[in-house]
Curated annotation (Swiss-Prot):
<feature type="binding site">
    <location>
        <position position="235"/>
    </location>
    <ligand>
        <name>NAD(+)</name>
    </ligand>
</feature>
<feature type="binding site">
    <location>
        <position position="385"/>
    </location>
    <ligand>
        <name>NAD(+)</name>
    </ligand>
</feature>
<keyword id="KW-0547">Nucleotide-binding</keyword>
<dbReference type="InterPro" id="IPR015590">
    <property type="entry name" value="Aldehyde_DH_dom"/>
</dbReference>
<dbReference type="Pfam" id="PF00171">
    <property type="entry name" value="Aldedh"/>
</dbReference>
<keyword id="KW-0614">Plasmid</keyword>
<feature type="active site" description="Nucleophile">
    <location>
        <position position="291"/>
    </location>
</feature>
<feature type="binding site">
    <location>
        <position position="108"/>
    </location>
    <ligand>
        <name>substrate</name>
    </ligand>
</feature>
<feature type="binding site">
    <location>
        <position position="159"/>
    </location>
    <ligand>
        <name>substrate</name>
    </ligand>
</feature>
<keyword id="KW-0560">Oxidoreductase</keyword>
<comment type="function">
    <text>Plays an important role in phosphonate degradation by catalyzing the NAD-dependent conversion of phosphonoacetaldehyde (PnAA) to phosphonoacetate (PnA). Has low in vitro activity with the related compounds phosphonopropionaldehyde (3-oxopropyl phosphonate) and glyceraldehyde 3-phosphate.</text>
</comment>
<comment type="subunit">
    <text>Homodimer.</text>
</comment>
<dbReference type="InterPro" id="IPR016161">
    <property type="entry name" value="Ald_DH/histidinol_DH"/>
</dbReference>
<comment type="similarity">
    <text>Belongs to the aldehyde dehydrogenase family.</text>
</comment>
<dbReference type="GO" id="GO:0008911">
    <property type="term" value="F:lactaldehyde dehydrogenase (NAD+) activity"/>
</dbReference>
<dbReference type="InterPro" id="IPR017656">
    <property type="entry name" value="Put_phosphonoacetaldehyde_DH"/>
</dbReference>
<feature type="binding site">
    <location>
        <begin position="290"/>
        <end position="292"/>
    </location>
    <ligand>
        <name>substrate</name>
    </ligand>
</feature>
């Protein structure tokens, strides 16, 4: 047993409803995936708890100035940086990712709050002169943005801090009230973030965090009459359930992906080594539990025999094990059931003709970086969203049209990465790939926290996340005009 395991203290957290601590007799256990021990409990909240939170949000009229919003957001960012060890411990304990990955997540959340703080003092209202045509008048038309009644934010397990930050920070920046329902698997980080925001000066009525089982509280998060917008990050089935039940409410749905990294045949040996670095890092960071993780590597046939050994070499270097050990590169996935499912997909791919090149063995939720070559492109391993540190290589023809067709042949359309030095081929793939983002010489998921991000097809409903796009989605545009002699 490690020292980290010996010193774990179980956290019993209440909900935060407009700053008030609310508990229930029934509790939801939060387990450490590394050893399946209970590391915390949260209330098994019910619909009435969400209903109360939305009623408070709807009744409150935020009056924060842009300066005050910026001050709160930047103070939150600084608190995240100052408390990064404590916060990353909570993330690792409830999610199982390595300390290196959880510290990186805290850094990303710092970026979100910093950028939201910078953007909230910027006024993007527009002015239109009306004397532009023979039918014009001596007037000017102006636009301004106003907050919504209440925002419902439903967040996934794989980024317990950053996904909450991406919904809460833009809401604060636009003077909105938001109710957050984190997944029951990793709820404790969201509760800690709420406390940090209250301490930074956020009026408590502007933020509530409710917890509980989806069957008990989920539908209220979607259908409550005070909710103007539902923002959700998570699985495709749940996203479609929200779309079917939210009806006329606005929805920002960021769903799954099976993002490709595409390796083209114009690469030198040095280029292939660089591409292998991207492939392995993109497939295994955060234990592969990212919607934008590299979930299939499409390698053109004529360079595959040179590329695959480079991937194998890098995968074998990864240290996997105790997430709290500072030397660990790769921690666990969310639970043993998920690890077993992804391992089963690997074995099924092998039955379909794939070659398992590296699989040092699974232990509970600890799934190692498994390298699989010659995966059939119709295998579930690469057709479905395999949310773990699997490194599947699909050999594709030395033909760009055929490669693009294969890349587009799944139900998802989130993002992709392409490794090529040919500018004309870059343009062809940017135009031809049916995804929300194309990154050249970078992993599919690369972005900064304020750039537009989102998918098409089953990966989302076309609305974008990122601080700037979220601030637009979280507001109504009011148009008014004045005489202007």
């Amino acid at each position: 047993m490690t020292n980290a395991e010996v010193t774990i203290a179980v956290r019993h957290e209440p909900m935060r409803i407009a700053g008030r601590l609310v508990d229930t007799d029934d509790r939801v256990e939060v387990r450490y995936p590394w050893n399946d021990t209970v590391v915390g409990t949260v209330p098994a909240g019910r619909a009435e708890h969400a209903r109360e939170a939305f009623a408070i949000a709807a009744a409150y009229q935020p009056k924060l100035t842009r300066y005050e919003r910026q001050k709160i957001l930047l103070a939150t960012a600084e608190a995240l940086a100052a408390r990064k060890e404590e916060i990353s411990d909570v993330i690792t304990l409830e999610l199982g990712i390595s300390k290196a990955d959880s510290l990186y997540e805290v850094g990303r959340a710092f970026d979100v709050f910093t950028l939201a703080g910078q953007m909230c003092i910027r006024d993007d209202g527009e002015i239109f002169s009306c004397d532009l045509t023979p039918h014009g008048k001596a007037r000017k038309i102006f636009t301004m943005r106003e907050p919504l009644t209440a925002i419902s934010a439903i967040t996934p397990f794989n980024h317990p801090l950053n996904m909450v930050a991406h919904k809460v920070a833009p809401a604060i920046a636009t003077n909105n009230c938001v109710v957050v329902k984190p997944t029951e698997l990793t709820p404790m980080t969201a509760l800690l973030l709420a406390d940090i925001l209250y301490e930074a000066g956020l009026p408590p009525e502007m933020l509530s965090v409710v917890t509980g089982w989806p069957a008990d509280i989920g539908m209220e998060m979607i259908t409550n009459p005070h909710v103007d917008l539902v923002t959700f990050t998570g699985s495709v089935p749940v996203g479609k359930l929200i779309a079917a039940n939210a009806h006329y409410k606005r929805q920002v749905l960021e769903l799954g992906g099976n993002d490709p990294l595409i390796i083209l045949n114009d690469l030198s040996d040095d280029d292939l080594a660089r591409a292998a670095d991207l492939a392995v890092a993109g497939a295994t960071k955060n234990s592969g539990q990212r919607c934008t993780a590299v979930k299939r590597i499409l390698c053109q046939e004529s360079v595959a025999d040179r590329f695959v050994p480079l991937v194998l070499e890098r995968a074998k270097r990864l240290r996997f094990g105790d997430p709290m050990d500072r030397s660990t590169d790769l921690g666990t996935v969310i639970h043993e059931k998920a690890a077993a499912l992804f391992e089963e997909r690997v074995m099924r791919a092998a039955e379909e003709g794939a070659d398992i090149l590296y699989h040092p063995g699974r232990s509970g939720a600890l799934l190692p970086p498994i390298v699989v070559d010659r995966v059939p492109h119709q295998s579930d391993l690469v057709l479905e969203e395999t949310f773990g540190p699997i490194i599947p290589i699909v050999r594709v023809p030395d033909d760009d049209d055929a490669t693009i067709t294969l890349s587009n042949s799944t139900a998802f359309g989130l993002s992709s990465g392409v490794c090529t030095n040919d500018y004309r081929r870059m343009q062809k793939y940017i135009a031809g790939l049916k995804v929300g983002t194309v990154n050249i010489w970078e992993v599919p998921g690369y972005r900064i926290e304020m750039s537009p991000f989102g998918g098409i097809k089953d990966s989302g409903n076309g609305y974008k996340e990122g601080v700037i796009e979220a601030m637009k989605s979280f507001t109504n545009v009011k148009t008014f005009s004045l005489p202007w002699p």
